[in-house]
Amino acid sequence: MGHLFAAPYAIFEPSLCFVLTIDSKPCGYVLGTSDSIMFSDICEKKWFPELRKRYLLPNKEEDTLENNFLRYLHNKQTQFKWAKDYPAHLHIDILPLAQKKGYGSKLITVFIKQLNYLNVKGVHLVVGKKNQNAVGFYKKVGFQQLKELEESIVFGKKL
């Protein structure tokens, strides 16, 4: 999962990668891109081809998290219906020991400050519907629901 949702951001857009540490130990991060379409193009040319060779498309339609990620990797990410108004996107992950202590809000604030510095007008993200803690968190930090998909929700925030 890190090869898909973390590493390419650190390589291609390191100015939008922030790590949360407590007592010098990493326990969370927020990362993303200022331009989802441009980032997708770069990944299609420079990142995904090698990953697709390494992680083959599963033969079975088995509905596991790993298989879903592999199918995501092998489907070219070309549609960003909300990218005109919300061109940036982000991923955030915080270990349980650091959750519900205000660190998530602080990470989002740092990320958005950097987007403002880059003159980006909006940011979006996708979260699984079953992750109700995250859904509540994004609403709390000012994201609005843009679209409800089969298994996920797209949130956006104007800057």
Predicted regions span which residues?
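Conserved beta-strand segments that form the floor/walls of ligand-binding pockets within enzyme
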Residues: 19, 89-93, 126
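Conserved catalytic-core motifs of GNAT/GCN5-like acyltransferases
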Residues: 37, 124-126, 139-140, 144-157
